[in-house]
Regions:
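Catalytic cores of carbohydrate-active enzymes across secretory and cytosolic contexts
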Residues: 1-142
Length: 142
């Protein structure tokens, strides 16, 4: 899901986002009482919470409880360079046997490294917090 501001209430609301990976992974996270670490699609201020899903939401991420979601925040330009530059411009063609379509950019690579460093930091922090509150917290799947 991504977050969108409701124009009437000015509160964040969850909106479904497309993606096969999310569709496949979300039910596993939910059934395993896991933690979802991801980009919410917007910048959240310190202390702003992820809202619960709408009770009528039937999308795969609807069952992710807000206290099990860890948002990762990025500068929009860095995220765009990471996602559209490195992931879609470089990795996607390479992983789909189209190396002639791959585009290589040092800036996109730097953005990719910065985004992954932030994801790693949030993941380690979440695992450390989980180990403090639940000594039998299982095995992390990344």
């Amino acid at each position: 899901f991504v977050l969108k501001k409701n124009e009437l209430t000015l509160k964040w609301e969850r909106k479904a986002s497309a993606g096969g990976l999310v569709t496949a992974v979300a039910p596993v996270v939910i059934q395993g009482n896991g933690i979802w670490i991801g980009w919410a699609g917007v910048h959240l201020e310190e202390g702003e919470k992820i809202p619960e899903s709408d009770p009528n939401d039937k999308t795969p991420t609807a069952g992710l409880l807000s206290d099990r979601v860890i948002p990762v925040d990025f500068d929009p330009q860095i995220f765009d360079s990471y996602y559209n530059g490195c992931c879609n411009g470089t990795f996607w063609p390479l992983f789909h046997s189209m190396p002639d379509r791959a585009q290589f950019s040092a800036d996109s690579w730097k953005s990719y490294c910065a985004v992954n460093k932030e994801f790693a930091s949030k993941t380690v922090g979440a695992l450390e917090n989980l180990s403090r509150v639940d000594t039998d917290s299982g095995t992390p799947l990344v």
